[in-house]
Structure formats: C-alpha cells, structure tokens
Amino acid sequence: MKKGLLTGLLLFGFFFGAGNLIFPPTLGYQSADQLWPAVIGFIVSGVGLAIGTLLIGTVINGGFKKELDEKIHPIFSLAYLIALYLAIGPFFAIPRTATVSYNIGVAPFLPDSKSGLIIYAAIYFAVAFYLAYNRSSLLSSIGKILTPIFAGLILFLVVVGAFKFGQTSPELAGKTDLTAAKAFGNGFIEGYNTLDALAAVAFSVVAVNTLKEFHFSSKKEFEKTIMSVGVVTAIGFSVLYIGLAFLGNHFNVASALAKDADLNVGSYVLTMASRELFGTFGQAFLAVMVIITCLTTTVGLIVSVGEFFEETFPRFSYKVYATVFTLIGFGVATLGLQTIIAFSLPVLMILYPITVVIAFFVLVNKKVAFSKRGMQLTVALTTIISTVSSLASALKLEGLAKALEILPLQGLSLGWMGPAIIGILIALILPDKIKGEAFDFEAFQTK
C-alpha cells in the first residue's frame, strides 16, 4: 500500500503543472452544451495517452531510445527525441509555465502592461536558472510536498464552485453547430496541450530510477503496483479535469471578454472564481501556489532537457545547455501565453500521433511480432499525414484541407489513424518480423 501511494504521488508529481489547470476550464467554456463528449476526448488524450506512455516506459529494457533505435532507425530516434525535448523544454513547456504563473499569480494585481510580463519573466527565469544551474534538490523536495496539497486545494475550489455556479447555464452564443463528435475531437486535441504524453517519454527514465528504490520483492508485486497506481492516477486526474471543465462551462465569462485574443479563458476562470468564492486572500493564495508549482516544473524541465542534451551531445557541458535553454525560455515567454499556445499546437499535432504509434509498437511488440519495415512504414505514414494535416490547419490551406477529408476521422483531426492502422496490418503481414524483449525484472532490480 505504501509503495502504491508513493508511486502514485510520483506519477502525479510528474504530470501536474499549471498547464493542466488552464486547459480544462477553457475546454469547458468552449464546449457549451456538449461538455461531456469534450471532456471524454480530453481525458483520453490528456490522461490515457500520458499515463499509458509512462507506464509502458517503466517496463522497457533500455528505455524508448533503445526501442526506437532497434524498431525504427537511430537517425529517426535522435530527431524525434530532440524535437520532443525541445517541445517539453525551451520552446513550449518552460516558457508556458512562466506565462501561466504570471497570468494567474501576478497579472490580476497589476495594470494591463506588456512590461509587467517581461519584468516578471526576467525575475522568474533568474531564480529558475540559479536552482537548475546548481541542480538544487530543495525546490524539488518542496514541490513533492506542495503539489498534492495544491491539487487538493484546486479540487476544493472545484467542488465549492460547482455548488456556487452549477446552476448557471453554459454560454451557447456562436456554438450552436457544435456536435458531440466535434466536441470529442476538440477535447482530444485540447488534451495535446498538456504535453503530458510527450513528457512521459522523457520522464519514464526518471520514473524507472525512482521505482528501483522501492525494492519490489517480485515481478508480480511490481506489475500489480504499477497497474493499480495507473488506474488510481488516471481516476484522480479525470476527476480533477471534469471538475475544472465543469467550472469553466458554468462560470460566467462575458462574450466580449472571451473574444479578447490576449485573454486565456482558463486562467481567467480560475482567477475570478477564486476571488468570488474566497475573496482577495483566496486569490492571493492561489497566486502563490501557482507560482511555486510552475517554478518547480520549470527547474525540473531545465534539468531534464539539459541532461539529455549533455548526454546526447557531450561537446558542451550541462551548465552551457541550462544557460542556453533558460535564455530561450525567457525569450519565448515574453511573447505571451496565447501566442505560445498558438505556435505549439501545430507541432503537438505532429508529435502526438507519432508518440501514440511508437507507444503501441513498444507495448504490443513484446507479445506480437511485427515486421521492422512495416513498423517503419507505419511511423512514416503517421508522420507524413499528421505533418500535412497540421500544416493545412495552421496555414489555412483550404484546398489541402479539403483533400485530406477523404481520410476517416479527419473531421476530428484524427485522420492519421486510418493510415496508421493500415501500416500496422502491413507490419503483421510482411516477413521480416522481430519481437521485442520481455521485461527483465531481475535486470531492473540489479541495475
């Protein structure tokens, strides 16, 4: 029981960040009277893919890189992991933590000014850099204590908010054409924004090293603990997401305000709901907790990404990479939260489908033999379709977008699934089959 609880807190700590707070309320507001299909879509991608990928990573002999080298190609493996670490690092996740903490924790107390964000980001990244440069464990230790407390407080906010605002009807203006299927697709894509499935690939190495410290007595105990913790963590996040989405769905956001391109609805809902329910003190308390949680996440990401690049390209030291990535994160953060989200989504719509296919092959190939060429074809098809689809959407290429509608589920931004399934079937038919190694529990315990 103790191992399960500790492991659950470990997994929760890996994923919980301010980004997990702002997207469910935004989705709730946008989904109008189609809240449940939207939330289910969000949970499938934001919870299911993330926790599934991390759990798969804990039962791989050698990690995702070794699997990609063997099943696909070392060059693809390197390119994919570099793109992934840059996404969860200096380009998207790191600057987003700064902007989210500013939007929720600082901006409500300041006059509207661009300089406020720049000054805050400079101080924020100076502190983060100092802690990451010296690889301080202090903030990590604080984060392990504060993260579950903060999550509990957010859940309390959600429960109180449900009673306070639950009778308010969802905003339907301009959303009458939203179907259940479209809402599910919107929720599924919105779940990409959490970045958790991508982070799971990176954090699986840390998870394995931490799990080794528990000294499981048998493989059965290890597997039972992992599965039960996965279920419990999934339920916990799902309850949190449902509550936050419900709050966003029923909290009154003026239509004119919601149209402001610089406003993040999720941040606004959390901030204003805290103020209405608990007054200025409650809002200030939320602000402090968000800033500390975000700072913890930022330091952890700078360290993880810096260590990956130091190991991959040892010509430069960790401290050089930490410096460079902190500066990049600061520069991107000054663009503002909405701009970061807008630029990140097209990239995530490419990386997420690839990650799903990779996780599928890594898991299933332990039991079912697949052709190596077939697996390469599947990843190639997924990469091409998701890239073309993302570009068509981002660049508003109507002709290309129309042509892609021939693909099943393309209307839900899941057009890559059809070609991926065809690739998987081909991988089952072609002769050059290989089978992944079974999880070596003894080696896991002794390494």
Model-derived regions: residue spans:
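Hydrophobic alpha-helical segments and their helix-loop junctions in multi-pass secondary transporters
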Residues: 90, 94, 151-179, 197-198, ...
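A generic transmembrane alpha-helix motif of multi-pass inner-membrane proteins
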Residues: 183, 375-447
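TM-loop-TM module centered on a large, flexible mid-protein loop between adjacent transmembrane helices
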Residues: 64-69, 240-295, 346
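Hydrophobic, small-residue-rich membrane helices and short re-entrant helix-turn-helix hairpins
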Residues: 134-145, 184, 207-236, 254-261, ...
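Selective recognition of specific alpha-helical transmembrane segments in multi-pass small-molecule
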Residues: 48, 52, 149-161, 226-253, ...
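Membrane-water interface regions at transmembrane-helix termini and the short interhelical loops
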Residues: 59-67, 125-146, 213-216, 330-343, ...
